[in-house]
């Protein structure tokens, strides 16, 4: 959530930056008008309350003097009615203002490239060289079926489209991958957490999914619970409504969890394979940092995600998202895109973002600065480290052999009992 004071005092700059994120000037001008009306009304209400207090004191004095106070009582009743009506109007204006402030996206950092959509993202660097096959490479969904380790047909039967069963060595490979990821992040100072897989509506508001992106989630009807779309939600809300000791920052968390997404608006996209599912595992990284350290922490977090891909020897590139392609809460985002041979392209496997104080303001996560003792909003960061299903897809395709088998990356073999190859039965 944006700082209303910043919008008010630096309106033109904020408007220009939000315009690069698709927020039209009319919306902000309407918000500005409502804010001014509210502030003017607050002044009037305070004046009326002061006048009411004066009349109340005069009534008390008249009664002590045994004087007639009917006129003053009538005047006070009129003032009270006016205050009540204005308070109701204020409540309406507050609700409108809240609707604006909670649905506006974050202000992009000055280093973010300006652009309308993903076509204007900027490649930062590449690592590794895509493999050249001397045979026709298969897509991961075909490899998974041929090796009898992924079963979409029964996933669709039991649940529906975009669900599957991992079985045998497929299930073991998935488990090996996320255990490896958690171990690597642990070496970098992240505290491993097992989170709830359901959160309440306040938590969804805190990280920015609610109210704007409610349709993308799975709510449990007649409850206050929502299936988590990412472990970012419970991990970030861990400190909601708390004041942390500045000496403890930065704090690093990591968690593996299922993620549940309705994929509203994704009809017809990635209908086969592991790229876009309603339920998938993801290892998440979350950081709580001081404002002056958060961009250094973003670079470190991105490097932590890259470390996983490098140790798996999977070619990838790092892309700086432009203003028009960033997520709602992000001030700056790097996407890591892994090479998928069957599609002859790079696909997102991680997204690392600094939300600055956007989520912290919504969730009221603050810290006490040890230097001056003041309580301040901290910065929150989040990143995938990595999406596990997409990592399975990348390994199956990049490590496939001509005989239909798949070589297991060396770093994963200790997690799979020393197994080196998944071969057709």
From Swiss-Prot:
A GO CC term assigned to this protein in UniProt: cytoplasm
Transmembrane intervals: none
Gene Ontology molecular functions: ATP binding; catalytic activity, acting on a protein; serine-tRNA ligase activity; transferase activity
Organism: Streptococcus gordonii (strain Challis / ATCC 35105 / BCRC 15272 / CH1 / DL1 / V288)
Protein name in UniProt: Serine--tRNA ligase
EC number(s) given by UniProt: 6.1.1.11
Encoding gene per record: serS
Chain positions recorded as ATP binding sites: 261-263, 348-351
Gene Ontology biological-process entries: selenocysteine biosynthetic process; seryl-tRNA aminoacylation
């Amino acid at each position: 959530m944006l700082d209303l004071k910043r919008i008010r005092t630096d309106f033109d700059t904020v408007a220009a930056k939000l315009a690069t994120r698709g927020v039209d000037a009319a919306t902000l001008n309407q918000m500005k008008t409502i804010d001014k009306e509210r502030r003017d009304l607050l002044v009037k209400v305070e004046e009326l309350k002061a006048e009411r207090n004066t009349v109340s004191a005069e009534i008390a004095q008249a009664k002590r003097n045994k004087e007639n106070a009917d006129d003053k009582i009538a005047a006070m009743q009129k003032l009270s009615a006016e205050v009540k009506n204005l308070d109701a109007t204020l409540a309406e204006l507050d609700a409108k203002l809240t609707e604006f402030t909670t649905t506006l996206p974050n202000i992009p950092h000055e280093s973010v490239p300006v652009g309308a959509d993903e076509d204007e993202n900027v490649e930062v660097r590449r690592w590794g060289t895509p493999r050249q096959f001397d045979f026709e490479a298969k897509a991961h969904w075909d490899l998974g079926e041929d090796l009898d380790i992924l079963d979409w047909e029964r996933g669709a039967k039991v649940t529906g489209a975009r669900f599957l069963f991992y079985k045998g060595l497929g299930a073991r490979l998935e488990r090996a991958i996320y255990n490896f990821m958690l171990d690597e992040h642990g070496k970098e100072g992240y505290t491993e957490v097992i989170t709830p897989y359901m959160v309440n509506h306040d938590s969804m508001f805190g990280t920015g999914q609610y109210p704007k992106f409610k349709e993308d989630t799975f709510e449990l009807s007649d409850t206050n619970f929502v299936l988590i779309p990412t472990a970012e939600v419970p991990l970030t809300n861990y400190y909601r409504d708390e004041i942390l000791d500045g000496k403890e920052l930065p704090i690093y968390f990591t968690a593996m969890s299922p993620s549940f997404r309705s994929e509203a608006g994704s009809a017809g996209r990635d209908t086969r394979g592991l790229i876009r599912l309603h339920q998938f595992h993801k290892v998440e990284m979350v950081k709580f940092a001081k404002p002056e350290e958060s961009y250094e922490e973003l670079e470190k977090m991105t490097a932590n995600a890259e470390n996983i891909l490098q140790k798996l020897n999977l070619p990838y590139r790092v892309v700086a998202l432009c203003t028009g392609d960033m997520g709602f809460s992000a001030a700056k985002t790097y996407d890591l895109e892994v090479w998928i041979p069957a599609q002859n392209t790079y696909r997102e496997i991680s997204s690392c973002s600094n939300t600055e104080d956007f989520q912290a303001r919504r969730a009221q996560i603050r810290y006490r600065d040890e230097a001056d003792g003041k309580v301040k909003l901290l910065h929150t960061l989040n990143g995938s480290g990595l999406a596990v299903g997409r990592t399975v897809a990348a390994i199956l395709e990049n490590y496939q052999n001509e005989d239909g088998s798949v070589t297991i990356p060396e770093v994963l073999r200790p997690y799979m009992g020393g197994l080196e190859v998944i071969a057709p039965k």
